[in-house]
Amino acid sequence: MLKNEELLRFFKTAYCFTDSQRNTAYENWISENVKDKIVIDLGAGSGILCYLAVKYGAKKVYALERRGRLIHRMKEILGDTVEYIHADLLETELPECDIYLHEWLTSEFWNEKRFLRNFYEEGDKELEVGHILDLVEYAKKNNFIDKLYPNTVELSSIEGESITEYEDIKLYSHGKYSRQFIEEHYSDLTLNSIYKNRVDSKEVIWKGHIKDLKYMRVNNYLGWILSFDNEYEVSNHLPISHWGLRHGAG
């Protein structure tokens, strides 16, 4: 358990690579779409999405990450199979790519900074994060909004509850290469903090392409689903997820 806790402290928000629903959605889509393509992960964290892109035959893979220690760890795992960009997304000129992968770290769709305060003290550079709409605006400005994935969004007003628990990672439930990544490089990591989500009522308030996303507020919890052309969903209100309804409407 001590080793498990040390790894979670090291990764802080990047431990989402142990979430099987997240890994399965990304791996399924990557397996069908990256062969012979140039791919960048915008916030590579553990490096698992870059690992998947390499395994499924991407022509070139870039890992963009602002945290130096995570770049160092990725290099230990991925070596020279990817090119590393140690920089902040919104302050960086990106290479031309066919696919731009992104992921939202937190249950708080509009306010990632509020979530990150659980991990970092005020004034820490890690709190200098952009809003999801900043990413959308940046992608439009730099002409890759139609290459940004996941690319479809559903927002909803939800009444329900999320309970946090530690649960076995259940390697058997992960995709082939996601499972291999964890087995080969994080075999000591056996437990993950997850949300068990209960949805009592749900009203969809918006659904569309991420390029048309605008700020919306609800009186209850804000439920969200991100998907790849309406397939392979990740969500903060699936029955079990590392995202939850815990952080309010915002």
Question: Residue spans of the language-model regions?
Answer:
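Phosphate-coordination loops involved in phosphoryl transfer and adenosine-cofactor binding
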Residues: 36
